[in-house]
Amino acid sequence: MSITPQEALQRTIEHREIFHDEMLHLMRLIMRGELSPVMAAAIITGLRVKKETIGEITAAATVMREFARHVEVQDNSNFVDIVGTGGDGSHTFNISTATMFVSAAAGAKVAKHGGRSVSSKSGSADVLEALGVNIDLQPEQVAASIAETGMGFMFAPNHHPAMKNIAPVRRELGVRTIFNILGPLTNPAGAPNQLMGVFHADLVGIQVRVMQRLGAKHVLVVYGMDGMDEVSLGAATQVGELRDGQIHEYEIHPEDFGMQMVSNRTLKVADANESKAMLLEALDNKPGVAREIVTLNAGTALYSANVASSIADGIQLAREAIASGKARAKVDELARFTQQFKQ
């Protein structure tokens, strides 16, 4: 079913849904650069004001996946993506990147999909470069990295070239749009399991249902109720879990896992170098909030990857991976492996 851009805009003004096939058509126009910047800006702003529906987000994610440069991974077992929407304004060190190293050391395969800074002063790409990792890899090189090291980083601009058509519009608008929530839904390696942090409580139920429609296996969508797009130590965390096609929504607390509730204020950083220093402190097993929050998030990721049978079991595996030095060794392993592809 086709819809004109003008009809779509009128729908958003009237707070009416754009149906699945119509949204597929619209998104393809956007990704091919066939909508004028004015019309593209009007539609994505209209969707934001109306509030995007699960159906609209699912259709948009389907099209972004169509246009992506895919990473072919042979073995999907224990394969997980660890990602946040960003935009939570917390300015913390890069917790999800530290979580990747711990999870890989404990037996998961991690396909991390990310870019430069959104909410932190240092995005996953920024801190990985500071750690000596070459992020500018071709899809087949990322696949080799996952096979060899258990980790692969997919720098979003390399895998979503069609996004260049909407990037100037997004930059000029300067407000959140549907594209802020599409990134975590469009992992180019198609990881069936995911730990996804979101920037608003309302997104927990929405994103987990979108992942259900997209055919994901085991997903935990999390929102720290102190505002973090991570599992938080400073408050309860709202969780939407998809497993075996079923969705369960619940809350978890640090105390559930024998951890103390502490403020996340000490996790704030000013730039990629500070983020790197705090990440390495955590992986070097230095006692403190950084190590604890990485352990908590890695435990959750290991549960999502089906390496662990529960979050508590995952936390135990994460502690062992850090204490043994295996997690810290993963940093150097990824840096060494990716540098061979440097142009």
UniProtKB/Swiss-Prot annotation:
Q: Name one GO molecular function term.
A: magnesium ion binding
May I have one GO cellular component term?
Answer: cytosol
Class of the enzyme per the UniProt entry, highest EC level: transferase
The EC number(s) this enzyme carries: 2.4.2.18
Q: How is the cofactor bound?
A: Binds 2 magnesium ions per monomer.
Disulfide bond entries: none
Q: Which residues bind Mg(2+) 1?
A: S96, E230
Q: Which UniProt keywords apply?
A: Amino-acid biosynthesis, Aromatic amino acid biosynthesis, Glycosyltransferase, Magnesium, Metal-binding, Transferase, Tryptophan biosynthesis
Residues reported in the UniProt entry to bind Mg(2+) 2: D229, E230
Binding-site list for anthranilate 2: R170
> Residues that bind anthranilate 1, according to the entry?
G84
Gene3D superfamilies linked = Nucleoside phosphorylase/phosphoribosyltransferase catalytic domain, Transferase, Pyrimidine Nucleoside Phosphorylase, Chain C
Pfam families, per database record: Glycos_trans_3N, Glycos_transf_3
Q: Part of which pathway?
A: Amino-acid biosynthesis; L-tryptophan biosynthesis; L-tryptophan from chorismate: step 2/5
The cofactors required by this protein are: Mg(2+)
Q: Which residues bind 5-phospho-alpha-D-ribose 1-diphosphate?
A: 84, 87-88, 92, 94-97, 112-120, 124
Q: Which GO terms describe its biological process?
A: L-tryptophan biosynthetic process
Catalytic activity, per the record?
A: N-(5-phospho-beta-D-ribosyl)anthranilate + diphosphate = 5-phospho-alpha-D-ribose 1-diphosphate + anthranilate
> How does this chain assemble?
Homodimer.
The UniProt family comment states: Belongs to the anthranilate phosphoribosyltransferase family.
Name the HAMAP family for this protein: TrpD
**Function, in words:** Catalyzes the transfer of the phosphoribosyl group of 5-phosphorylribose-1-pyrophosphate (PRPP) to anthranilate to yield N-(5'-phosphoribosyl)-anthranilate (PRA).
This chain belongs to the protein called: Anthranilate phosphoribosyltransferase
Please give the organism. Answer: Paraburkholderia xenovorans (strain LB400)
Write the gene name: trpD
